[in-house]
Amino acid sequence: MEKNAKIYVAGHHGLVGSAIWKNLQDKGYTNLIGRTHQELDLLDGVAVRRFFDEEQPEYVFLAAAFVGGIMANSIYRADFIYKNLQIQQNVIGESFRHNVRKLLFLGSTCIYPRDAEQPMKEEVLLTSPLEYTNEPYAIAKIAGLKMCESFNLQYGTN
């Protein structure tokens, strides 16, 4: 990436997104774009489309997600799968529509089987059951991963 490339970090105030943001700044990238949830609701497809139309990012880091702890995962199962699928569909779809040079989609350790050996290896993905309490979130993340893979295979995106 060029140091002045337009880079959008979705979720730049979260745990992972803020680390990505800081790392990019430390490496001298000068054209970083970030929006808080109040400034841009990633669940709103029209707002996401408008943002991409206006900002025209060249690179996208998708670190935004609807997250919670064990209790929230148990109570709000529908919200976890629905909201994460919606965020991913909006950001990945607009990244494709705007021909971004590269999209980095972040998964989660919870996409791996519940009983995966440590350290986890990519080959064990989808080989056995997920942890039940994380299942809706994990399935949404797996769907995002497969969505990116499918765009790459069908359209040659990166």
Walk through the language-model features, giving the residues of each.
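Conserved Rossmann-fold NAD(P)-dependent oxidoreductase catalytic core, especially the SDR/UDP-sugar
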Residues: K3, Q89-N134
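SDR active-site strand-loop-helix element
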Residues: A10, R35, V60-F66, L103-T109
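Adenosine-cofactor binding site in Rossmann-like domains, unifying the SAM/SAH pocket
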Residues: Q25-R50
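NAD(P)H-binding glycine-rich loop region in Rossmannoid oxidoreductase-like domains
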Residues: G45-L85, R97
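Conserved mid-core alpha-helix of short-chain dehydrogenase/reductase
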Residues: A47, Q86, N90-E94, M147
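Short alpha-helix in the Rossmann-fold core of NAD(P)-dependent oxidoreductases
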Residues: F80-Q88, N99, L104, A140-K141
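Active-site Tyr-X1-5-Lys
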Residues: Y132-N158
